[in-house]
């Protein structure tokens, strides 16, 4: 990226997020990561490295109890709530998802392209989450996709890359609503089933339901069964399979339709759910 384009991007980031809405990493190479910095937060999908956070992926991983593998020595620039995003040796941005064998995903060819993508995402998220206007939400989704391709024509070449996963997550509720149900036991042993239906917006039905129950004073140990219409996800910004397994280790989990770990499996799960809904409606 040229110096002029760097300056234009820096001005756009400051104009949109404000100085306090950006976090710089002074040890980073020259560019947006050092000045003016990346957004502190963009919806559920990105949160910049905190001022007191470990700077290497390996340090962060060790503190969290997992092995970062080949990414251990790299500069950690933020998180999506489950994957750690980092500055790679070839100056690209990548994301590592912890697990038995860490999954390493392409994100962007450089920090500038990533910052432009985050700027687009933050501008368009409110419209994409406009549950009362599905036409507006779909138009904003398409604008985001085209904008990302304009920034990086190869953004969607790898369907398992980070940006394709973000867009899959945004598209899911635009295609079809899905639901979740928790069975909750009270202090007297009485049971009740509580449900939530998802739709356009930034929270999955599991997240909405747990937020609601926590606000009512329900504790995690009271959740004994979890049913999700779509298999709990491992998608950027959510990682429902992971947080629910952590929150409800005692619960029995079932789901109606596989969602899986690949783009193909996710697409097949959505199609199966849509077909089931159409059949029920006659």
Language-model region placement:
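Compact, glycine/acidic-enriched structural inserts
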Residues: 101-130
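Zinc-dependent deaminase catalytic domain
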Residues: 122-282
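A surface-exposed partner-binding patch
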Residues: 1-86
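N-terminal accessory interaction module
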Residues: 75-77, 114, 233
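A short, sequence-level motif marking secondary-structure junctions
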Residues: 90-92, 112, 197-203
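Structured loops at beta-to-helix junctions and adjacent beta-edge loops in soluble globular domains
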Residues: 78-80, 96-98, 185
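Short acidic-glycine loop/turn motifs at beta-strand connectors
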Residues: 81, 87-91, 184-191
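Intrinsically disordered, low-complexity regulatory segments enriched in Ser/Thr/Pro
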Residues: 88-105
């Amino acid at each position: 990226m040229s110096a002029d384009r760097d300056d234009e991007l820096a001005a756009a980031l400051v104009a949109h997020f404000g100085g306090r809405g950006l976090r710089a990493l002074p040890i980073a190479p020259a560019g947006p990561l050092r000045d003016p910095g990346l957004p502190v937060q963009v919806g559920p999908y990105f949160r910049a490295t905190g001022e007191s956070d470990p700077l290497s992926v390996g340090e962060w991983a060790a503190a969290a109890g997992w092995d970062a593998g080949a990414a251990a020595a790299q500069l950690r620039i933020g998180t999506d709530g489950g994957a750690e995003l980092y500055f790679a040796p070839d100056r690209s941005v990548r994301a590592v998802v912890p697990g038995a064998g860490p999954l390493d995903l392409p994100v962007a060819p450089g920090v500038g392209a990533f910052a432009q993508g985050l700027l687009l995402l933050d501008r368009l998220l409110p419209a994409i989450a406009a549950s009362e206007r599905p036409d507006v939400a779909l138009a904003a989704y398409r604008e985001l996709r085209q904008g990302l391709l304009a920034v990086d024509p190869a953004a969607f070449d790898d369907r398992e890359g980070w940006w394709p996963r973000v867009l899959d997550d945004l598209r899911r509720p635009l295609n079809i609503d899905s639901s979740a149900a928790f069975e909750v036991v009270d202090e007297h042993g009485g049971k009740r089933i509580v449900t939530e239906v998802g739709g356009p917006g930034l929270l999955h039905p599991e997240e909405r339901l747990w937020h609601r129950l926590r606000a009512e004073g329900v504790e995690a140990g009271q959740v004994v069964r979890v049913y999700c219409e779509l298999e709990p996800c491992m998608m950027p910004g959510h990682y429902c399979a992971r947080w629910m397994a952590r929150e409800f280790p005692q619960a029995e989990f079932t789901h109606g339709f596989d969602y899986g770990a690949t783009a193909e499996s996710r697409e097949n799960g959505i199609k199966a759910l849509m077909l089931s809904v159409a059949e029920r409606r006659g």
